[in-house]
């Protein structure tokens, strides 16, 4: 008797998973479930592998160390990637985007500061760096790896160094 040939696992593409958005008022203190868990599509060429749960270990503003009692030291972010899609979940927001250089497929969500102000952000990968450019605002937000650390350059000359504390499907650490 012949054994049935096992079926290869189904490929789940980034397109197969609905785009996520920040819930009204943000997600609060409890991280939502990961968005791209089921996705099996490989990362696009040129995408740095930023996947994981990340926690701040140091921060500077205009080159000056930020005091360790500041809120940024409690900052945790989850980065998920699949194909050309990237999702950052942190600070009460879910920024789900295609990293394809278009405003149409970039972030369409709200600011972390008030959870209501709409934003549209173009996302690209440039020389191993994830670059975000808000439409109509002359700034860049970047994330890149330096060894095993994630370097996040944010608005106002803020640079945050984060350490991976888990995978993208792991629960966030206690803060």
Predicted regions: what they are:
Residues 50-65, 98-107, 111, 119-130:
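Short, basic/low-complexity N-terminal boundary segments at the transition from targeting/disordered tails
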Residues 89-91, 134-136, 143-145, 154, ...:
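Residue-level recognition of conserved beta-strand positions in structured domain cores
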Residues 79-83, 99, 125, 144-146, ...:
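Generic beta-strand structural signal
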């Amino acid at each position: 008797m012949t054994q049935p040939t096992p079926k290869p696992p189904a490929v789940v593409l980034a397109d197969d998973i609905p785009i996520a958005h920040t819930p009204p008022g943000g997600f609060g203190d409890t991280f939502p479930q990961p968005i791209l868990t089921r996705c099996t599509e490989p990362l696009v060429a040129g995408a740095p592998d930023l996947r994981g749960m990340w926690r701040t270990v140091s921060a500077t503003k205009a080159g000056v160390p930020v005091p360790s009692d500041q809120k940024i030291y409690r900052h945790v972010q989850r980065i998920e990637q699949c194909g050309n899609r990237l999702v950052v979940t942190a600070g009460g927001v879910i920024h789900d985007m295609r990293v394809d250089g278009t405003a149409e497929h970039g972030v369409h969500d709200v600011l972390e500061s008030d959870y209501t102000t709409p934003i549209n952000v173009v996302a690209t990968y440039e020389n191993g760096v994830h670059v975000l450019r808000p439409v109509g605002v002359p700034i860049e937000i970047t994330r890149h790896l330096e060894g095993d650390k994630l370097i996040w350059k944010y608005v106002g000359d803020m640079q945050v160094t984060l350490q991976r504390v888990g995978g993208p499907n792991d629960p966030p650490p206690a803060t």
